[in-house]
Structures are given as C-alpha cells and as structure tokens.
Amino acid sequence: MAAIVFGVVVSAAAQKGEGYQFTDKKVVKTVPITNQYRSGTCWCFSTLSFLEEEVLAAGGEQMTLSQMWVVRHAYFDKAIKYVRLHGNLNFAVGGAAHDVTEMIKKYGIVPLEVYSGYNYGTEMPEFGEIDNVLKGYVDAIIRNGNGRLTTAWIDGLNAILDTYFGVRPEKFTYKGKEYTPKSFAESLPIKMEDYVEITSYTHHPFYSKFILEVPDNWMWDAMYNIPMGEMMAIVDACIEAGHPVAWGTDVSEKGFSRQKAIAVIPEVVEKNTIGSDAEHWGKLSDAEKQAMINNLEGPMKEKTITQEMRQEAYDNYQTTDDHGMVIVGTAVDQAGNPFYKVQNSWGDNGPYKGFYYFSRPFVEYKTMDIMVNKNLIPKDIKKKMGL
C-alpha cells in the first residue's frame, strides 16, 4: 500500500516510521574509509580506494596509496596545459577517475606513509590556500607582459608544489624493499591499462568513444558510450565478481541525504491526481520539499528512469560532474527495493560509518561515468564496445 504525502508516494513502511532497513546482498572486500576533508579531491580519494580494492580482489595485500602524490602531479600537468591554452581550460582541483590511472602510468605511485603530501601544517587536506595560490600563479604567468614565457616558470610551479605537498622521493623503502615510484606501481598485482571508463548519453553514438563534455575532464579523456541498461549490467557484473566500481555521479539531487546516508529519486505524483495536496506541495520552498523527502522514514516509490531522462538531466545541467565514490556492493531495503552500497570519502561517520546506500534508480539517473576492469565486462557487451 502507499499514501500520498505532499506529492510524494510513500510506502506503508514509511508511514509507520520504521526507517530504512538495508540488507547487504553482495559486498566486495573494502579498504578503510578515507577523508578528503576540505578539498575537492573526491576523484582521487575514491579512485585510489577503488584501485586498492582491486589489489585486494587480485589477491594482493591491503595498502593505502598516497592521494597527494596523485593530486600534486595532476596539478602540475593541469598547469602546463592551462598555460599552453592561454587559460582556456578549467583550472581547479576537480578531476576524474582517469586522472589517477594516467598519473600512475606517468609518474608511478607511492604508499601514503612515504608521501603524505601534508606539508603545510595540517594532518588532513585543506586546499583553500593551495587552490588560490596555484590559480594565481598560472594566471600571472599567462598575463605576463614580456611577450614570451620565461625559462623559470616551470621551476617556480614545482617550487610551489614542493612547498605545499613535499619534495618527491626518487627512491624509498617499503616493507624492507627498495622501490622507485615507477617500480612500486609495477609491483602491484593490477595494471592501469586494464581500466576503462564508460558513460551513457545519446548526443554521441553508442558503441563509440567520445570526450565527455564536463569541466573537470581537463585531460579530454575519451570514454566508451553504451546504453544505460548495459552500463548497469556492467556494474552488476563487477560486484558479482567481487570487484568494485569507481563511480562519477551528482549528489546535488534532492533525494540525497547526507545525514541519513541514503539517496533516492522519489516519484512525485502529478498535480491533477492529488487535489489540494498538490496545491500545498507547489507552495513549498525547495528547502521545505527537501525536508519532507528527508523525513520520509522508509521505502518510497521511485521514478522509472529512462535513457531520455538521463540525457535531459545532463543537457540541462541537472546532472554534472559533482562527486566521485566507489560502488562496493548490492543491497535491498525492507520492501525489497534494490540499492547499491557505496563507499564515500567524507570520513567514517554517519549511520553506516562512511558508507551510503543509493537506490538503483538514483544510479541509473545520476551516473556520469564509471571506471571498471575491462576484463569483467560481459562478453556480449565487450564485443559491441570493440574491446
């Protein structure tokens, strides 16, 4: 049974105030929750957690890789490209999953204990100053009145990065063995070349690759484009095989509750079906509507997501490159509705100690892109992708 509460269809469980109750169905091996704190580095924290969990899935040992090693090198490469393009590029701390794999290919990787990257008086990332200093520097380089760039500007850039993140080690010892960053990356039981990014939009042909047009794709990386149903089938296949999925999404949707660590896409009933309730709903502010949705303590009817809905949300800026996390499992609520268990990088707090539950409709609707091990893609889909 269901009742209509201010335009949202609510289940009987919600009316009883039972709250959401989740049962995990399949959860992969996970590493500890991390905390990006006051930095826009979700793309790095989430993708490194994803890769660390891929190491576990491959039979390797648990480790924590240096997030700031990746961020430092990404900022360097981004600065070079920004200056080359005379500032016509998004120069900010945001990024995507491929930033991580590409930086590891190019610069290697080191454990966190070797390079923390917090060389500015804090024990957690706080990027307000760093972001502004770096943006001010590259803009000053572009604006210089000399008519040409000096030979010193790249040294100056490296000096800023080394000051904030620390000098990079050429060699280091880890568990009694000496490595370079490149040799340590090669020692991992996973290969960066095995990871591909997938998206699902109709403004480019399916079964082709295209550069996803979002500001944080500063690398202009091309992704595989496939139908939504096949993208979801890949997510399910990875989890079933015991592997995580790196997930680029948008958590600005009204059905996302940070406090409750739950995200849904509530079905709002058409106004002409609910009389005075619709009138009342229409008069509520966005904050009041959000409060109503957040206070629905239990399963609710959700929208049926279509390919067209995904595209419209992307075209209208309703879905943007907002946040990166890791899908680590499947679950159901007490009504049997399918959810995904998701690992966030906002610290080990909240009702599920840093994990969140996102409904299947939310993932269908709000997925910008995923990164997966290409060897886990179902054969029929993989063939159509040309892999």
What spans do the regions from the language model cover?
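Bacterial Sec-dependent N-terminal signal peptides
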Residues: 1-17
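Compositionally biased, low-hydrophobicity segments enriched in charged and small polar residues
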Residues: 16, 72, 295-299
